[in-house]
Amino acid sequence: LAVKNLHRSLVIGCSALALAGCGADDIASPGGTGVVINQPATPAPTPTPGPTPTPTVSAPDICPNLTNDGSVQLTNAGTISGPTGSYRICQLPSLITKSVELPRIAGVLYGMNGRVDVGCDGGFSAPSAGSPYNSTTIGCGTLTADTGVTLSIAPGVILIGQTGQSWLAVNRGNKINAVGTADKPIIFTSQDNVAGFNTESTQGGQWGGVVLLGRGKVTDCNVGTVASNTCERDTEGAVNLARFGGNDDTYNAGRMSYVQIRYSGFVLSNN
């Protein structure tokens, strides 16, 4: 996936050439059938298949600490086994309130059980003491400044959607920094992918996806109007508000490169 500055509201997971053209309910990236960090070169055809690989990954006993003050805590959600070994699921909180990095630790998966918000929604433009904003994000309240949270993800980290309704929302005034490498891509995928239930014919729709909510101009308003330069829009299908739009076409929601997004595109709601 090419390095891009990501503007407005982008849903990552369609195609690397159409990042801005994806809707929140139509993203899909089938990917592989099992979680493999280092993708091997295509082998020459052989008359007989090789033996099934021996699982090499073992789950650690505990989840890592992300912050010294305990402000962002992971929940130990048990283990899961698949063709590549056993993993411990370290579940992200529903609201990430402080900048953190998810480190790569052998046998650790970072889980999303439902919607995970990166920071609080800061509104159409950055709030201030003179112009506070009542954030639409659950658990945030009134803001007098952007929360400025950055979720950083180390190369080789695997994140999973534990349910169909699981998705990552990077709210206005916050960022994601997910920069993998060619040999250690960052993988967002479904729990079934890790468990080895998926096949070559498995389609997307097993979890929601990754949504970047920005302050670029939009024209399909359901809040405000284009004429008054107050146009905003709600993310389709979100149970609770996930709003995007503003008046800053230079807005930067972070950086993503060498990222795989597999089996995403679950329909969050029928409307």
Predicted regions and their residues:
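Beta-strand/loop edge motif enriched in small/polar residues
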Residues: 23-271
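C-terminal motif of bacterial Sec signal peptides marking the signal peptidase cleavage site
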Residues: 18-21
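Bacterial N-terminal signal peptides that target proteins for export
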Residues: 1-10
